[in-house]
Amino acid sequence: FGGPLGTRRVFSNRGANGIDGVIATAIGVATEHSGPVGVVIGDVATLHDSSSLAALARRGLDLRILVVDNDGGGIFHHLPQKTVVDPRSFELLYGTPHGTDFAMLATAHGLTARVARSRDDVQVGAGTTGPHVTVVKTDRERDVAAHRDMHKAVADALRDGR
């Protein structure tokens, strides 16, 4: 999913809630693109557009999907309601854990899939001719801490003129 920026075209999708139709959009891009297409997508967005996996399997496009699976709505852990809603209610209303096995879901739709357990596994998935799904499992609380550390490092660098 990487490479020199000059060799990559970037597309984005903005559904009604920001997560609608991301896979369908990627299928459209892959239909008109002569090379491989990669999409990085969250687990909840994948659930919202999972029927597109069946459409993808029927088309045989070289679309490589990386699902970041933190078992729910991780974005909400970065927003103010995380600190004002009691933890049990927060998890029910915002965390929305689903317990979905995305590799199994992709396989059920006729796609090849793998769960990445290392960076090398992610690289193998990214290099697998599609349609292919690679799932990376993450932890929401650790993600928040990592984002906080990155934001601090950037703020410190900007403040110090680095």
Task: Tell me what each language-model feature is.
Residues 2-162:
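Thiamine diphosphate
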